Design a protein with these regions (language model features):
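Active-site acidic Asp-centered loop
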Residues: 2-3, 53-56, 150
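Short glycine/serine/threonine-enriched helix-capping/active-site loop
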Residues: 80-83, 176-177, 184
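A short, conserved alpha-helix in the catalytic core of glycosyltransferases
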Residues: 64-68, 122-147, 151-180
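Conserved donor NDP-sugar-binding/catalytic core segment of glycosyltransferases
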Residues: 57-103
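C-terminal, non-catalytic tails of nucleotide-sugar-dependent glycosyltransferases
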Residues: 78, 88, 100-127, 137, ...
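Glycine-rich, basic loop-to-helix element that forms the pyrophosphate-binding segment
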Residues: 28-45, 63
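Short aromatic/hydrophobic "clamp" motif used to bind/position activated sugar donors
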Residues: 50
Length: 218
């Protein structure tokens, strides 16, 4: 899904990959809304498995997609997330815990990627409450059943909300540490201190509190 790119290099890249009949390039011309963009992509997708992948994620292990698919094909699984690593080889994501920071947060952030963490949880295939959608695979049937991403959550918590809807529908959400990718997300990204962004973030927090209060309390 193309979203308001401006550089010549990216359009040269699009022309090159468009020669592959397996690739279908579509353009989102509205303002940024992570949930709406992904829902738009799904409407134009044809497969029974969906892969959500941010543009700042790069491959470490070549078999990462096959690894995710093998887990996602299990009858009881609805979604699969991966181990994401910063360029300095510390952990960016090893699953999400509900309640960290008030709503949800990543486990083992900034821990060296070769460490296994408390009870080896950073290195064990396991069920989670949520995983990040920076790299997440879902069954199409599960995605459709839960209604996709909630578009009121334009930036924050949309993946957490989707995962909670998925588990509520009876599926498992699985963290797979054997699929590893780099995530170039800035470790020093500033706070949401723009007034418009602050108000948007507060609305998203309120949405999560209103819709998932029973889970957040526990």
């Amino acid at each position: 899904v193309e979203n308001n790119s401006t550089t010549d290099e990216i359009f040269d890249y699009y022309r090159k990959i468009s020669e592959d009949p397996r690739i279908h390039l579509i353009c989102w011309k509205k303002e940024f809304n992570y949930s709406a963009i992904n829902n738009f992509g799904v409407k134009n997708a044809r497969g029974e498995y969906l892969l959500f992948l941010n543009n700042d994620v790069t491959v470490i292990t070549e078999d990462w997609m096959g690894e995710m698919l093998g887990v996602c094909q299990r009858r009881e699984v609805g979604a699969v997330g991966v181990k994401l690593i910063y360029p300095d080889n510390t952990i960016q994501h090893a699953g999400c815990v509900i309640g960290i920071g008030g709503i949800a947060g990543h486990m083992f952030v900034d821990m060296p990627a070769d460490r296994t963490g408390y009870l080896h949880k950073a290195s064990i295939l396991q069920d989670m409450s949520a995983v990040t959608a920076a790299c997440m695979m879902m069954k199409r049937s599960a995605f459709d059943k839960v209604g996709g991403f909630t578009e009121e959550l334009a930036v924050a918590f949309n993946d957490v909300d989707l995962c909670l809807k998925t588990t509520k529908a009876g599926y498992l959400v699985v963290y797979d540490p054997y699929a590893r990718l780099y995530h170039m997300e800035s470790k020093t990204r500033g706070a949401e201190n723009n007034e418009v962004k602050v108000r948007r973030f507060q609305r998203e927090i309120e949405y999560m509190r209103c819709n998932w209060i029973d889970i957040l309390k526990n």
